[in-house]
């Protein structure tokens, strides 16, 4: 069985948010003010997540990424990854801010995690604190080092570039990739911040990032699957390390999108910028059979949006910020 939408796109990737809680308050994601987290009984339990993962697997989902919030703040995430491994999920990955990674990396590998993305938006400790509103720079850097010495190497490091904040670090990040032999990915700033300060002038286009790095260290493109979000590049001089450019604002890839999201409170989102959540949790808790769940998921995915519409004049950002959607 396979999931398709009305535009003929096959859905093979699922982002699973296991918590809406996070120990960071990144400026492009969360408000500086206290936020109302979901009550614990509103969040999908591990048994519910186990069951839903199995249902999605029968629908042809091959890749599952564990996200948050910050997934490592929820106890039991290693056991959940083990469950995904036991389901024979083809690709199991995680996105994390890296704060708890050094102490959890070995357990994650043992559980069956295959790939990891670590958020790092500055190589300057003071600026890092300004962006994340934490003093966790040393912990994150240590986590990256631990990953690079593990079976998860090479790790992927994600930087969201915001004009006037960290756009002066592009070349430093590229040098970091070369020094650590890791995959450095630059992501355009999207209108998903809780304070709704996003505007197009804050976006650093992927083309600008490419030109700046290429002028310093010539790059050559690496072939990629049409549904991948990142354009990938290696260094022509053969130095280990890789550059990835993710350009949802200036070079949308919606036409080849293969992803849907399951939020921590059990809602399906067919796009990061969906205006509507589809309530899987209520159906689950009302005693739906697996067949009922399959029917509902199939109908929801069939109506997946054509695209995010960021570049349309009538675009409005979603009411949920990134931390409540899941990365």
Regions found by a protein language model. Give the residues of each.
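A short acidic, helix-capping loop that chelates divalent metal ions and anchors anionic groups
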Residues: 34-39, 124-131, 193-197, 279-280
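Residues that scaffold the ATP/ADP-binding catalytic core of kinase and kinase-like folds
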Residues: 25, 29, 126, 131, ...
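Radical SAM/AdoMet-radical enzyme domain recognition
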Residues: 43-66, 70-187
């Amino acid at each position: 069985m396979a999931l398709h939408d009305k535009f003929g796109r096959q859905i093979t990737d699922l982002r699973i948010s296991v918590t809406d809680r996070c120990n960071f308050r990144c400026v492009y994601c969360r408000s500086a003010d206290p936020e109302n987290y979901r009550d614990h009984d509103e969040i999908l339990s591990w048994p519910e997540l186990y069951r839903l993962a199995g249902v999605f697997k029968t629908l042809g989902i091959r890749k599952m990424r564990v996200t948050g919030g910050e997934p490592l703040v929820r106890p039991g995430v290693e056991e959940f990854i083990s469950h995904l491994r036991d389901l024979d999920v083809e690709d199991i990955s995680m996105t994390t801010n890296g704060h708890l990674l050094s102490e959890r990396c070995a357990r994650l590998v043992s559980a069956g995690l295959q790939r990891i993305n670590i958020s790092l938006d500055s190589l300057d400790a003071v600026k890092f604190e300004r962006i994340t509103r934490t003093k966790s720079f040393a912990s994150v850097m240590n986590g990256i080092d631990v990953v690079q010495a593990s079976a998860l190497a090479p790790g992927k490091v994600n930087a969201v570039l915001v004009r006037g904040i960290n756009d002066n670090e592009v070349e430093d990040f590229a040098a970091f990739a070369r020094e650590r032999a890791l995959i450095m990915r630059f992501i355009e700033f999207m209108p998903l911040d809780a304070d709704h300060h996003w505007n197009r002038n804050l976006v650093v286009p992927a083309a600008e990032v490419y030109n700046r790095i290429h002028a310093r260290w010539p790059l050559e493109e690496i072939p990629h699957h049409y549904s991948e979000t990142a354009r990938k590049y290696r260094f022509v001089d053969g130095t280990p390390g890789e550059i990835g450019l993710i350009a949802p604002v200036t070079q949308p890839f919606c036409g080849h999108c293969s992803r849907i999201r399951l939020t921590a409170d059990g809602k399906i989102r067919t796009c990061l910028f969906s205006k509507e959540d589809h309530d899987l949790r209520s159906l689950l808790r009302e005693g739906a059979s697996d067949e009922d769940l399959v029917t509902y998921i199939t109908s929801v995915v069939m109506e997946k949006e054509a695209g995010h519409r960021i570049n349309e004049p009538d675009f409005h950002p979603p009411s949920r910020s990134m931390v409540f959607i899941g990365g």
